[in-house]
């Protein structure tokens, strides 16, 4: 069972916390991690690309010249694909790129990402994280006391407006609640700070 240090907001270690082996201590599955990341990135694509085919381009209803007798190749429309300004053949059309993975696969990917962070000493657990007012300098002080100076993902048990507002002006810092934790965010950030209550919620869902 993985055991990590427990810190307070001033950066002092106040104890240790045991993490669920089935969530934070598994052997990471890189193939499943890859599948989950690709799925998430695909779901984020807009898919609004569009071009006009020959039926959608304005004009071209009249035959440009008669069928026979001109010596030129026969043409039926000035909007045929071979004409300048004509329609596009097999061009992109609006579509949804998103797809789904099985629930077991998604959960395994999330466990793999969390276990990787623990194994690399990139996961910090806070006793609690709350501010009386949404002050950026307070969040900066917390990160500084924990010696976090790179991209960091902060996971709280539930949405806290003061914490969210205090961190939004800090580059490379993102706040999610325990229900919104995902593989892409975990992989994209160098450090992950999780509150003790958030750990309990994550273990409740994934264990």
UniProtKB/Swiss-Prot annotation:
Key word Ribonucleoprotein present: yes
Record's keyword annotation contains Transport: no
Transmembrane intervals: none
GO MF annotations in UniProt: rRNA binding; structural constituent of ribosome
GO BP terms: translation
Basic and acidic residues composition bias: residue spans: 47-59
Pfam families xrefs: Ribosomal_L4
Regions of compositional bias (Basic residues) in chain numbering: 60-71
Disordered, as annotated region: 44-78
Alphabetical UniProt keywords: Ribonucleoprotein, Ribosomal protein, RNA-binding, rRNA-binding
Record-level GO cellular component terms: ribonucleoprotein complex; ribosome
Recorded superkingdom: Bacteria
Family named by the database record: Belongs to the universal ribosomal protein uL4 family.
Quaternary state and interactors: Part of the 50S ribosomal subunit.
Its biological purpose: One of the primary rRNA binding proteins, this protein initially binds near the 5'-end of the 23S rRNA. It is important during the early stages of 50S assembly. It makes multiple contacts with different domains of the 23S rRNA in the assembled 50S subunit and ribosome. Forms part of the polypeptide exit tunnel.
Name of the protein in question: Large ribosomal subunit protein uL4
Native organism: Brevibacillus brevis (strain 47 / JCM 6285 / NBRC 100599)
Taxonomic path: Bacteria, Bacillati, Bacillota, Bacilli, Bacillales
Name of the gene this protein is made from: rplD
